[in-house]
């Protein structure tokens, strides 16, 4: 098993959710799982809505990105989480 870089797309529940606070919660949650958060980008979508794209580095293992996605989806201000890119390092 190797190391993978994963780009996730995290959608907040509304445009009113503070981008910086959500990014900090995402980073804290990921790092509490002993996963490295390399970068976080925030991209505007429409009507004030935005998406947060954390880039994480983790060990390739059974279950893939599911544990991380579930942990982030359980955050109060998160509507949805999906993997948009996975590559072996």
Curated annotation (Swiss-Prot):
Keywords for the protein's UniProt record, in alphabetical order: Elongation factor, Protein biosynthesis
Keyword flag Acyltransferase: no
InterPro entries to which the protein is assigned, alphabetical: eEF-1beta-like_sf, EF1B_bsu/dsu_GNE, Transl_elong_EF1B/ribsomal_bS6, Transl_elong_EF1B_B_arc
GO terms of molecular function: translation elongation factor activity
Gene3D superfamilies: 3.30.70.60
Pfam families assigned to the protein according to its UniProt record, in alphabetical order: EF1_GNE (PF00736)
UniProt signal peptide: none
Family assignment from sequence similarity: Belongs to the EF-1-beta/EF-1-delta family.
Function, as annotated: Promotes the exchange of GDP for GTP in EF-1-alpha/GDP, thus allowing the regeneration of EF-1-alpha/GTP that could then be used to form the ternary complex EF-1-alpha/GTP/AAtRNA.
Protein name listed in UniProt: Elongation factor 1-beta
Gene that specifies this protein: ef1b
